[in-house]
Structures are given as C-alpha cells and as structure tokens.
C-alpha cells in the first residue's frame, strides 16, 4: 500500500512539473505532447534520444502521443524484428 501511495504522489508531481498540452503545437520544439498513461493529462516531454526505446508505428490519438514520444531530429525508429512494434532510435542514414 505504501508503494502505491508513493507511485501516485510521484505521478502527480511529475505531471505538475511538465507543461500541460492537448496537441503537438502546445509544446516547444524538441518535445512532444504525450500522455504517459490513460489516467494522466497530456504533458510536453522531450523527444527520444539515440539508443532509447521507441515505437515503430505512429502511436498518436487525436494528436497526442501515447506512452512515448517519437525519436528526435536526425533519428528514426529502427524495428527490432518483424511483427514487433518496438525499436530503438538510431541515426538516419
């Protein structure tokens, strides 16, 4: 129970630090509007960096990303294997 309370407090604190958003244009360059989960409001988060885990397919619903931002400028999401939606941000070649 203590762990759950700590997680809820952390989620609320993290949400309040981020700028709220409802669409991509609400966020500054180098960031995206995403909802970390179904229960949280949208917030501006940094685009993914080289080596970070990403989604190969577009994961936007109504111009808000779900769970992960896309890879940053000059990067693309390289698919791990066919049939898997996740990949890793790598330099565009």
From Swiss-Prot:
Signal peptide: 1-19
One protein family per Pfam: Prokineticin
Alphabetically ordered keywords of this record: Disulfide bond, Secreted, Signal
InterPro entries tied to this protein: Prokineticin_domain
Location in the cell: Secreted
Tissue: Expressed by the venom gland.
Gene3D superfamilies: Lipase, subunit A
Superkingdom field: Eukaryota
Cystine connections: 21-33, 27-44, 32-69, 54-77, 71-89
Gene Ontology CC: extracellular region
Family: Belongs to the AVIT (prokineticin) family.
Protein name, UniProt field: Venom protein 164
Annotated organism of origin: Lychas mucronatus
């Amino acid at each position: 129970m203590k762990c759950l309370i700590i997680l809820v407090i952390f989620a609320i604190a993290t949400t309040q630090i981020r700028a709220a958003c409802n669409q991509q244009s609400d966020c500054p360059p180098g960031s995206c509007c995403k909802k970390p989960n179904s229960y949280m409001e949208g917030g501006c988060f940094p685009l993914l960096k080289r080596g970070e885990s990403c989604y190969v397919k577009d994961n936007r619903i109504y111009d808000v990303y779900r769970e992960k931002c896309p890879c940053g400028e000059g990067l693309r999401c390289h698919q791990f294997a066919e049939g898997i939606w996740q990949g890793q941000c790598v330099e565009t070649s």
